[in-house]
Amino acid sequence: MIEVMDMRIEVVLLNSLAKRLPGQDPQLGDRLQSGDWTALRGERTAVQLALRWHHEPGVSGNSATVYLQLNGPVALSVSRVMPVPVRLPVYPGHDDNILTSQPGLIPDLLQALKPVEHPAGPAYLLRLTDGQWQVCWLELVVPENLASGRHDFSVILLDGDGERVADAGFDLSVSPASLPPQTLLHTEWFHADCLADYYRVPVRSEAWWQIVGRFMATAAAHGVNLILTPIFTPPLDTAVGGERTTVQLVDVRRDGDAWSFDLTALKRWIDLARENGIPN
């Protein structure tokens, strides 16, 4: 069963490419059908779960608390898809392959959820607002030892007392092949200065190195295998008269006509990247 609706809650499974803007219903072509979700062993893959609660006459309040449980052969991580305010979604001269040209709330941020205790066992707490869709991102890395073929998963929504209020099912088809090692070099912006500024820690402090390492590990988990390294700090994106936090890893010293270069911090950066799964 892909979609279920009782008197209170709608449950719809969507493919991972669907992006639902606030006020929009899930599109028919985005809905997950049996056999749609396929993956190789070792592949990171995901589906989306859309929920909408309808206010019941005679019940006070405009929101409902439900608890999400997932059952299947492997565990799925759960994140809430959060909309973020966007003032300029596209530049002039764009083509038609866009979500919207209007400013507003755009689904972008994945907010990881942790299970909480519940009478029926660990579950993810969700608060639903009357008439509004809330989307969850369900993700896994397919284990190398998972048998090929179809694997069934179930979604169960419970109230605070453990009563089932809605459910749905979906399936994953696993290929007998494994995802080969990544050879494409993939990098993303990695702002080491912003990490220092946001977490309010000094550059090169032990706290800063720990934070950088965690972000490197997260980048590697999402396919980044080449990291931008701040050997020097060029004045990029810096206002005239302003200053951007310096994070260059090469210390340069001039003594008369002689120059010396200390690569200690650069070596630590390279070692840290390799320890966290980024080889380049």
Q: Residue ranges of each PLM-predicted region?
A:
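Short, Lys/Arg-enriched N-terminal segments with co-localized hydrophobic residues
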Residues: 1-6
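Surface-exposed binding patches on compact interaction domains or structured appendages
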Residues: 7-31, 54-138
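Short, polar loop/linker segments at the starts of domains and inter-domain junctions
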Residues: 21-37, 201-208
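Contiguous beta-strand segments within globular domains
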Residues: 32-56
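Extended acidic/polar, glycine-enriched regions
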Residues: 50-66, 72-73, 122-183, 209
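Glycine-rich, aromatic-flanked loop segments that form ligand/cofactor-binding clefts
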Residues: 75-117, 183-188, 219-241, 274-280
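An acidic-aromatic substrate-binding cleft motif
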Residues: 165-255, 260, 271-279
